[in-house]
């Protein structure tokens, strides 16, 4: 297993070893390495996505991650942290969307009143904030368990990822709704928040898989 943390624009591919001193680089255009087309994605357009293909690429032993045949296990070890990361991305984006929506509803007027004065708007804002705070606390709990190598860390990371990414998308979607038709126009940030958070429910394991992990942990106890 090798790891490539650099984009296509880089001149080298860094292939880290488990021993930092052995970290080396190979040319990004080394024989056998090829790149697919830039994918035209729904969201996350600030981050280019391409397939990287290896065809009989020679990789020095010093650049190998761990023992041969252990690639899958090494990859799985990184998933818990990745799930915390994507959950945090959802919370941050949703927080921004909520702040923008809160400001907007105090400015937008209908029927001679700011729409923030309507009880329906207030209930929506209250629910958005409550769920966002709950999601943030769940992610913090899962991160703490991961840092402390708790035996249930994987389960808590799955719960945090599932909950926070669902909440994040829902908050952004509700924020777009509060903007009305303006929320659907690219001049305003809401449509991007919705597009970007949608993939969070898929990355690092779909939220359906998170439910499988959680349920299996419950049934083992």
Where are these regions (language model features)?
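Active-site beta-strand/loop segments that form the cofactor-binding cradle
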Residues: 1-3, 64, 176-179, 183-184
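Residue-level signature of the cytosolic catalytic core of signaling kinases
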Residues: 67-68, 117, 149, 186
């Amino acid at each position: 297993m090798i790891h490539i943390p650099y984009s296509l624009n880089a001149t080298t591919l860094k292939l880290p070893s488990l021993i930092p001193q052995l970290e080396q680089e190979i040319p990004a255009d080394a024989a056998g390495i090829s790149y697919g087309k830039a994918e035209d994605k729904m969201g996350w357009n600030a981050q280019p996505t391409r397939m990287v293909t290896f065809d009989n690429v020679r990789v020095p032993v010093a650049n190998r991650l761990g023992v041969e045949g252990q690639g899958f296990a090494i990859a799985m070890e990184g998933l818990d942290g990745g799930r915390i990361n994507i959950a945090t991305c959802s919370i941050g984006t949703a927080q921004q969307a909520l702040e923008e929506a809160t400001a907007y509803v105090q400015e937008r007027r209908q029927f001679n009143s700011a729409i923030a004065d309507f009880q329906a708007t207030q209930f929506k804002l209250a629910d958005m904030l409550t769920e966002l705070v709950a999601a943030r606390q769940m992610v913090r709990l899962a991160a703490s368990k991961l840092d402390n190598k708790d035996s249930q860390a994987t389960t808590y990371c799955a719960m945090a990822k599932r909950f926070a990414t669902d909440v994040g998308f829902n908050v952004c979607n509700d924020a777009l709704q509060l903007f009305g038709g303006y929320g659907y126009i690219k001049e305003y940030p809401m449509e991007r928040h919705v597009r970007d958070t949608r993939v969070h429910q898929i990355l690092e394991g779909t939220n359906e898989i998170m439910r499988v992990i959680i349920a299996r942990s419950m049934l083992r106890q």
